[in-house]
């Protein structure tokens, strides 16, 4: 993204990491403005003393993401998020996805958290390194299945399969549903496999971001941490 301006908390530019950011901006010719705590809070409650004014988030196409995997010579490893609402959950999953080498993340056009300052912050900047696409999920799933990609949806129903039966190798897409309702019916029916994580406690389910992160790591491990 193009950075237009950096806003730094007044009196903080001489301290640690913020001083490094200030000096880097000077070298790059980026405008730096001192602002009050109140102004930074109005931009993002968790600003850590600095905020950037940038161009809009550069969403990618489905084909951009497939090309990304192809250029790396790797089987596609994708993440579909079906109507996830919480910015913290989206940020957490973007962070995990970037760490384990997911080639792209897919969001629906509506009824979802999108890439906002809160999500960028929650992802610890991983959103800036991850290819994200907004699509019609059901249509995209059908298209990608025709290209040989298998879809595994996280589910808590009794009909869902156990971990031992799932093959995470090869072209793969993991689907994580919304916090309250899970996957929508059409998306759920489109999955090749439904996966239920084993649990031994009294709580019925895991947080969506936690469950998704666990399976992303398990898939990465199965793929040889490559």
Task: Annotate each PLM feature.
Residues 36, 82, 108-109, 136, ...:
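Short beta->alpha connector loops at strand-helix junctions that form conserved
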Residues 99, 121-126, 185-226:
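Structured adenosyl-cofactor binding patch, chiefly the S-adenosyl-L-methionine
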Residues 112-118, 181-190:
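Short, glycine/polar-rich helix-capping loops at beta-to-alpha or helix-loop-helix junctions
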Residues 85-92, 207-211:
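Amphipathic alpha-helical repeat scaffolds
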């Amino acid at each position: 993204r193009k950075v237009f301006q950096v806003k730094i908390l007044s009196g903080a530019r001489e301290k640690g990491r913020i001083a490094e950011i200030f000096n880097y901006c000077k070298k790059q010719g980026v405008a730096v403005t001192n602002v009050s705590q109140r102004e930074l809070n109005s931009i993002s409650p968790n600003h850590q003393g600095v905020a950037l004014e940038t161009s809009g988030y550069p969403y990618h196409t489905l084909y951009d993401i497939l090309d990304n995997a192809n250029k790396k010579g790797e089987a596609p490893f994708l993440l579909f998020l079906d109507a996830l609402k919480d910015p913290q959950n989206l940020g957490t999953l973007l962070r995990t996805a970037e760490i384990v080498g997911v080639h792209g993340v897919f969001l629906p056009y509506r009824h979802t958290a999108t890439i906002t300052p809160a999500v960028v912050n929650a992802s610890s900047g991983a959103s800036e390194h991850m290819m994200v696409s907004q699509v019609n999920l059901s249509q995209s799933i059908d298209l990608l299945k025709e290209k040989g990609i298998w879809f595994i949806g996280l589910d808590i129903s009794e009909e869902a399969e156990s971990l031992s039966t799932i093959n995470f190798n090869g072209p793969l897409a993991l689907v994580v549903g919304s916090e309250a309702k899970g996957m929508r019916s059409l998306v759920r029916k489109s999955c090749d496999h439904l996966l239920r994580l084993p649990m031994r406690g009294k709580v019925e389910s895991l947080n969506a971001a936690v469950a998704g992160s666990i399976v992303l790591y398990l898939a990465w491990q199965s793929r040889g941490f490559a």
